[in-house]
Amino acid sequence: MSSQCRSAALRLLKTRPRSVGEVEAKLKDKEFASGDIAEAVEYLKEMCYLDDRAFTVGWIRYRLARPFGFQRIIRELKEKGVAEGIIADAVAAAREEHPEETTAKALAQRKAERLSGIDPLKRKKRVLDFLLRRGFPMDAAYKAIKNI
């Protein structure tokens, strides 16, 4: 049964990188024994197929390219079962390279241009809501819509 669990875990990793928590949850959903799951996860870690630090850095890079704010990225990583310490380290490094206010301003400008035919107050509200859904903090979102 352990080899079936290991095979299922490898199939999960074929589609996209995953966190340890995601792999464990998916294998539990497939009703594998917890001992088999632990064995499979340990094997994948030894083979360097599972690494939460690398997954976190990659996920942050992927989501910043979309662009999303750090609040949403952090929430997504927690949902994926990544440890808070790993998230905090990776986010701290990424914040230095990608200031949220700059990203929020550029994104707000692009969104406002698409909403050019709308009443200015409604446009600001829609852009603000958009930025907040994207995970930008309230203060960065307000600064971004100030000159729209």
Where do the protein language model's features map onto the residues?
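An alpha-helical, amphipathic repeat domain used for nucleic-acid recognition
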Residues: 1-148
